[in-house]
Design a protein with these regions (language model features):
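Contiguous mid-protein beta-loop-alpha structural module that forms a pocket-lining wall or clamp
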Residues: 1-55
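Short acidic-glycine-tyrosine-enriched beta hairpin
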Residues: 1-13, 131-153
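His/acidic/aromatic-lined binding-pocket segments of jelly-roll/cupin-type domains
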Residues: 4, 11-12, 20, 110-112, ...
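A generic structural signal for well-ordered coil/turn residues at beta-strand boundaries
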Residues: 8, 16, 25, 93-98, ...
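Ligand-binding loop in jelly-roll beta-barrel domains
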Residues: 17-37, 142, 151-169
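Short, glycine-/Ser/Thr-/acidic-enriched flexible segments
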Residues: 19, 36, 96, 107, ...
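Glycine- and acidic-residue-biased ligand/ion/polar-headgroup-sensing regions
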Residues: 25, 104-134, 143-144
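C-terminal amphipathic alpha-helical segment
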Residues: 39-107, 111-114
C-alpha cells in the first residue's frame, strides 16, 4: 500500500481489484460500476443500522485483489468544451461510466437519453434543472446535494451558478 497526497479537485480512477482507502478529513464522490459487491478489508470498527460491527470480508477480498495494478491512478482532466456561461472538463471515462466537471455561470444544456440514467453532484453554488416536459417541475439543488436523472428524461437545462460533477452511465 502507498499513501497518496490528495488535493481538493483531484480525480483518481481506481480499477476493480485495487485495494484502496480514504484518509481522515477527505470527502470523495466515489463513482463505480453498478455492482452489489464491496469487500471490506478494514472498516474502522464502524457499526451497522443494528448496532453491530460491519462485516469484514478479508478472505474474499484477497481472492480479487490485483497486486499488479500501478499505483499512479491520478487522472488529468481534459477540457471538453468551453463557451460563454459554461465549461466542461472530462475527468474520467471507462466502459461503465463517464464523469465530467461542469462549471456553470449561466446555463448548461444536455440530454438524458433512453439508454441510462445520469447523476449530478453539486460541488458548490446552487441552481436548478429544467426539462422540456411541462409537467416536470424544475429540480432545485445546492452544494452537497445529488440529483438522479432517470433515463428518457430528454433535454435538460441547468441554470444557476454552480460547479457540478456529471456522471453518465
Amino acid at each position: 500500500m502507498q499513501k497518496v497526497q490528495v488535493h481538493k479537485g483531484d480525480t483518481y480512477f481506481v480499477p476493480a481489484g485495487m485495494v484502496h482507502g480514504i484518509g481522515k478529513g477527505i470527502l470523495v464522490a466515489e463513482i463505480q460500476e453498478s455492482s452489489n459487491v464491496t469487500y471490506r478489508v478494514y472498516d474502522y470498527d464502524r457499526i451497522d443500522k443494528n448496532g453491530k460491527k460491519r462485516e469484514i470480508h478479508f478472505d474474499k477480498a484477497v481472492q480479487v485483489m490485483d497486486m499488479g495494478i500501478t499505483p499512479d491512478v491520478r487522472q488529468k482532466p481534459r477540457m471538453v468544451r468551453y463557451y460563454s456561461g459554461c465549461s466542461r472538463e472530462l475527468l474520467c471515462r471507462c466502459k461503465y461510466f463517464e464523469t465530467e466537471r461542469v462549471q456553470v455561470t449561466k446555463g448548461f444544456a444536455f440530454s438524458v437519453l433512453d439508454s441510462s440514467f445520469q447523476i449530478l453532484v453539486c460541488l458548490s453554488g446552487y441552481g436548478e434543472v429544467q426539462t422540456m416536459d411541462a409537467e416536470q417541475k424544475p429540480m432545485r439543488f445546492s452544494k452537497g446535494e445529488t440529483l438522479f436523472l432517470p433515463a428518457r428524461l430528454g433535454r435538460c437545462l441547468v441554470i444557476g451558478e454552480t460547479e457540478l460533477i456529471k456522471v453518465r452511465c
